[in-house]
């Protein structure tokens, strides 16, 4: 994935170790080619899942202190964090930058720009549940969004239904909404930025 960040609005989540470089961000997930051959596609997907797990373990270890602060001692979450950090300590023998480079090479193994399927390996549902038909997914149309013209996949209804369920147009009850832990968020700067648009 690609991260677009602004330093004008300070924001820091659990995985932001360097407090000097904290800003509000959006993630843009890369659409990757995947193999038409089912065996090669499966191997690509298993590798993607393995690299995602290793990268997350290394990040857990790097941010162990901040993660430990959000979990009660001896809770299931605390045990989960400790186990991921132990694995992260082992994987950290190789620097995160090297793991990231290897992962990037692996997810982009398929060079066929006309493959039948594409995947979003960095997406929330990961490789196997984010497989899409190229002809449907990679064709785009323009729609109005927030007063601007934006290019979106022609098959956005299928995409949103896969990610959020068939009722994706309805705002879920507060208890069912996705939550993100923020250690720091400059709400005043965020509100000013929104008002100025």
Predicted region positions:
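Short, His- and charge-rich active-site/binding loops that engage polyanionic ligands
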Residues: 43-49
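Conserved catalytic core of two-metal-ion nucleotidyltransferases
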Residues: 1-36, 44, 56-164, 169-197
């Amino acid at each position: 994935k690609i991260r677009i960040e602004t330093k004008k609005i300070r924001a820091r989540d659990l995985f932001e170790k360097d407090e000097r470089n904290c800003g509000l961000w959006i993630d843009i997930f890369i659409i990757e080619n995947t193999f038409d051959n089912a065996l090669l596609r499966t191997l690509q997907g298993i590798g993607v899942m393995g690299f995602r797990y290793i990268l997350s373990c290394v990040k857990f270890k790097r941010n162990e202190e901040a993660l430990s602060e959000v979990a009660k001692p001896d809770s299931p979450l605390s045990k989960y964090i400790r186990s991921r950090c132990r694995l992260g300590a082992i994987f950290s023998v190789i620097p995160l930058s090297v793991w990231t480079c290897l992962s990037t090479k692996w997810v982009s193994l398929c060079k066929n720009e006309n493959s039948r399927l594409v995947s979003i390996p960095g997406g929330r549902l990961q490789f196997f549940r984010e497989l899409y038909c190229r002809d449907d997914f990679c064709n785009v149309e323009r729609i109005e969004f927030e007063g601007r013209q934006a290019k979106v996949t022609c098959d956005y209804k299928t995409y949103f239904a896969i990610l959020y369920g068939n009722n994706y147009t309805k705002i879920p009850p507060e208890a069912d909404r996705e939550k993100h832990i923020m250690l720091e968020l400059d709400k005043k700067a965020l509100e000013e930025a929104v008002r100025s648009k």
